[in-house]
Amino acid sequence: MKLDPLQLIEYEIALLVRLTTAHSPRLGSLDRSEYLILCELDENGPLAINVLAEKLMLNISTASRQVGALETKKYIHRYPDPNNGRISLMEITQEGQDILIKVQKARYGVYKEILQEWSEEELKQLENNLTRLNRDFKKWGN
């Protein structure tokens, strides 16, 4: 039986998630949630927990738990918002930036090795399609 393209896409995405999870130790010492939170804070911080949760499409309790774990590891610092003392802001620490850079280099190396036989055109096409797919998923989830 021939599967339609959407069935194949769904399967390939599920397989990709499984493969990246199975090989996550080679992708660095941060789990996916830690990595995404540190990336967001590095790019856009400092942020309040509700803003961070919204950007990463997490509920507040999940985001709070993950932020707490990163705070324990000293990868982020939480402090009162100077404009509203009832709100805490979070920013990435130097230790957080150091581990993020280390993990980004490891991840880059893995993807460079995996995609070494792809042409620049194929890489650009993959980049465009993944960016579009993520954007459409975010739109759909709102």
PLM region descriptions:
Residues 124-142:
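Exposed, interaction-prone assembly regions rather than primary DNA-binding/catalytic cores
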